Amino acid sequence: MTTTTTATTAKAPAPGETVLDARGVTMRFGGLTAVRSVDLTVKSGEIVGLIGPNGAGKTTFFNCLTGLYIPTEGEVRYKGQVLPPKSFKVTAAGIARTFQNIRLFSNMTVLENVLVGRHTRTKEGLWSALLRGPGFHKAEAASRARALELLEFVGLAAKADHLARNLPYGEQRKLEIARALASEPGLLLLDEPTAGMNPQETRATEELVFAIRDMGIAILVIEHDMRFIMNLCDRVAVLVQGQKLIEGDGPTVQRDERVIAAYLGEPFEGEPGEAEAAEVAAAEEAADAAAEADAETDADAEADAEADAEADAEAEADAGTSGAEADAESDADADADGDTDRTTDPTTTAEASGAKGSGKENDS
């Protein structure tokens, strides 16, 4: 089914348990501080906005929450448990995210992209995949069914077999959200989900986010579209120069003079200059590159491990086959030797007969 919830009729459910609890999160790159002592909580069924001028540290904070960066100070808890400093483990724990720049597998189909998001919820391992037994086929069918449900949910079911690169921009954004939902998260982080969208696409995204909220999923969203944020969010936190300036409901935040000054460009005391801001941006880019390299290394190591396991399985199978063939050949040789022993050689028989005849003549 496609989403039909609207912003004007959507009613937020009562917030449930605390899903995200970030305390004193600080991120430094060398001597530069991009995020400074930020506290933030998000409850299930709640939508929280994170806003601020460019370079305020919003995406850096997201990266600290999702394991792409390891915070210099502070801790991040998900449902009371401290999150491990690896992005794939954070995803497995129950946190999913989208990115500012769309990151889809462009040469894969829409359905295949969503199936990629299911891997953290698939219990079948390497051996099950190699043997392709009943358990593997059952899990594969369940993943496919769930992926199709999610495509229906975001309105892309009719394009399941299309290549991702052929989708319009707005639909690619929806696909990225569907892939994030495929991991069955308890917390969804959206980084500028309406960037580059027209008003109609923005409205559709708003409805989609409300529908996700109604599923009981907590949502933390970064966005520059203030109308979108104020319509959508139960609470809004403002970051300026890496620090949380204020947190509250939409009207309270909009009236705050410090927020107005930040967006109008009025300087704050101790505000970094352009050179320092450029250094922070360069440090973040270097950290992103290092994080991506680590992710690729982890993926390569996992692929090598799978290849080694597959090679061991093939070697074991070959050894079993060779051993069986050797045993069969040995048994055949033994049978042949037995038959030879039981078969009387004609020459030997003749000699034996002659000896017997000679004995009779001598007796005579």
How would you describe each model-predicted region?
Residues 1-26, 268-319, 324-329, 333, ...:
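ABC-family P-loop ATPase nucleotide-binding domain
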Residues 2-284:
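Glycine-rich phosphate-binding loops of nucleotide-dependent enzymes
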